[in-house]
């Protein structure tokens, strides 16, 4: 596998993917230094912070036995392996820490970045064990099954026929705002699996993929269990602990945080607003807005309902219209914490209250909104863990790599390397196209046209004083003529590039296909395409190969991997 690194700051072609905050966070800049100092508790580049955080975790009293019992039962329910169980058992020791990541349930695991998050947690746990052999580090994947965005959870995307194909699964029965993970797969899931498999070409690996999906996705099984079982099958050789946070026993472990939110609301929201102001003063937009109560209420139908606070001592469940005093809602939370679900703000705090979280593996969006939560963590007496960027990949298939070779020749720049061609594609693919159609001389042509236009404009301007002196009305005629000449030059310029485009039309079409592969729907590949597209072609061992790549590289740059 050939591997190339690209700085996040240079990636501009995809419409979405890497925010300014994330680019600064992963850079070597003064902006990063200030961002870490003002918005986070720890810097993963500072050795002293590692020992400080290990000491903080060692001082806390985690309910490890109850946590192990919960994870053991879930491991059995998710068809986990003995190797995973051995990882779970390590958590009994106060010298075992967790490397945590997570994602909501996705159909057939969802976008590629779900796999990349899990892989990064696995690899980082190994690396930390090498650095601190007296401790154990286990990778934990938080399944965000309480999220009620069913449209996102029930669909996935594959390449198909030179385009993209979205596959969507139907629910057996679903109410508005119902937790996506708890929703059962409908009777048509078998047909959905077959539709997905039909989009995959026949390979030596396809029968194994079919067996995995057909056994994990069955009518009546919840989206969460199907997702978890599929993840366990893919990570058999790389033990990953899966955690379902919708479990009643997990909520009992988190009861102190849940109750404190009810007891002190809207205090944590004020903290988020204050931290967001700091962030905005640094030039970064706030990613999320807090509610008065950063909890949802789960009714008997599994619907995730908002909790509003119309007055300091009164709470309202919307849209059920149930009203509670603070004391009443607090009693419900103490007796039945399973009726409450943290929102995007409280979720990481609940996570780090229950788990001995050494580090959290986050994507660009997550790191951006975690920057708003420092003061909220302090409100609950917690320190933020290390926040480490997940591995970010673009997988380049052989056909696309060959196109890159042709593009390299077409640019007319013999000094260009393959890495520089990828940089050009990721930085500005339109500029690269322009370079190709002019045989590598686009900059010279641009300069020549600009020179001609400038000289004509300057020549005409020398006429202006004499013409105005003769007849002031001639100034308008001169101005109009200047505009027409500029327009004519622009037309000639466009025709020049069109002539070049015809000359290189075939290669440009290949570049269009490469762009679709690298940036499907204008987004980074990892944000849309499903992992099984690649596992079907290159085998399940691809996950191990990507783990090896991560083992040797930092996650502070984007990785381009030629398969």
Curated annotation (Swiss-Prot):
Keyword Coiled coil appears in the UniProt entry: yes
Coiled-coil portions: 493-518
Keywords on record: Coiled coil, Ligase
InterPro entries to which the protein is assigned, alphabetical: Bacillithiol_biosynth_BshC, CC_BshC, Rossmann-like_BshC
Molecular function GO labels: ligase activity
Keyword set includes Coiled coil: yes
EC number: 6.-.-.-
Top-tier EC class: ligase
Domain of life: Bacteria
Family: Belongs to the BshC family.
Name of this protein: Putative cysteine ligase BshC
Organism: Chlorobaculum tepidum (strain ATCC 49652 / DSM 12025 / NBRC 103806 / TLS)
């Amino acid at each position: 596998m050939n591997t190339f690194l690209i700085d996040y700051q240079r990636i501009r072609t995809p419409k979405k993917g890497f925010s300014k905050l994330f680019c600064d966070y992963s850079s070597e800049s003064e902006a990063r230094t200030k961002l870490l100092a003002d918005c986070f508790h720890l810097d993963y580049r500072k050795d002293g912070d590692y020992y400080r955080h290990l000491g903080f975790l060692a001082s806390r009293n985690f309910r490890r036995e109850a946590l192990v019992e919960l994870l053991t039962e879930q491991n059995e329910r998710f068809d986990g392996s003995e190797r995973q169980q051995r990882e779970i058992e390590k958590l009994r020791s106060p010298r075992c820490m967790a490397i945590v990541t997570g994602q909501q349930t996705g159909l057939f695991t969802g976008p590629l970045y779900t796999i990349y998050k899990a892989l990064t947690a696995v690899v980082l746990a190994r690396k930390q064990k090498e650095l601190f052999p007296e401790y154990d580090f286990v990778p934990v994947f938080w399944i965000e099954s309480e999220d009620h965005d069913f449209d996102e959870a029930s669909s996935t995307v594959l390449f198909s026929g030179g385009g993209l194909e979205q596959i969507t699964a139907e629910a057996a029965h679903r109410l508005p705002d119902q937790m996506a993970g708890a929703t059962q797969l409908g009777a048509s899931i078998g047909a959905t699996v077959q539709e997905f498999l039909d989009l995959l070409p026949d390979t030596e690996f396809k029968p194994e993929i079919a067996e995995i999906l057909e056994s994990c996705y069955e009518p009546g099984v919840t989206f969460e269990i199907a997702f978890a079982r599929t993840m366990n099958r893919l990570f058999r050789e790389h033990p990953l602990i899966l955690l379902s946070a919708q479990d009643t026993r997990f909520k009992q472990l988190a009861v102190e945080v849940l109750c404190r939110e009810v007891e002190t609301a809207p205090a944590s929201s004020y903290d988020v607003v204050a931290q967001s102001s700091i962030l905005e003063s640094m030039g970064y937009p706030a990613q999320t807005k807090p509610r008065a109560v950063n909890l949802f209420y789960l009714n008997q139908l599994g619907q995730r309902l908002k909790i509003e606070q119309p007055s300091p001592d009164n709470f309202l469940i919307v849209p059920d219209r149930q009203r509670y005093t603070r004391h009443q809602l607090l009693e419900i939370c103490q007796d039945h914490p399973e009726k409450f679900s943290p929102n995007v703000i409280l979720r990481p705090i609940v996570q780090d209250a229950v788990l001995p979280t050494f580090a959290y593996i986050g994507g660009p969006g997550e790191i951006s909104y975690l920057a708003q939560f420092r003061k909220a963590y302090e409100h609950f007496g917690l320190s933020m863990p290390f926040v480490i960027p997940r591995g970010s990949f673009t997988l380049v298939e052989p056909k696309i790599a060959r196109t890159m070779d042709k593009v390299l020749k077409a640019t007319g720049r013999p000094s260009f390397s393959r890495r520089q061609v990828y940089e050009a594609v990721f930085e500005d693919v339109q500029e690269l196209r322009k370079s190709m159609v002019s045989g590598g001389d686009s900059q010279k042509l641009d300069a020549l046209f600009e020179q001609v236009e400038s000289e004509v404009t300057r020549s005409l301007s020398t006429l202006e004083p004499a013409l105005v002196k003769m007849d002031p009305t001639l100034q308008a005629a001169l101005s109009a003529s200047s505009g027409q000449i500029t327009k004519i030059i622009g037309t000639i310029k466009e025709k020049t590039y069109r002539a070049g485009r015809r000359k290189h039309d075939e290669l440009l079409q290949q570049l269009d296909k490469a762009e679709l592969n690298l940036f499907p729907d204008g987004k980074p590949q990892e944000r849309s395409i499903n992992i099984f597209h690649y596992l079907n072609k290159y085998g399940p061992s691809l996950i191990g190969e990507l783990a090896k790549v991560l083992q040797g590289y930092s996650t502070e740059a984007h990785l381009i991997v030629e398969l």
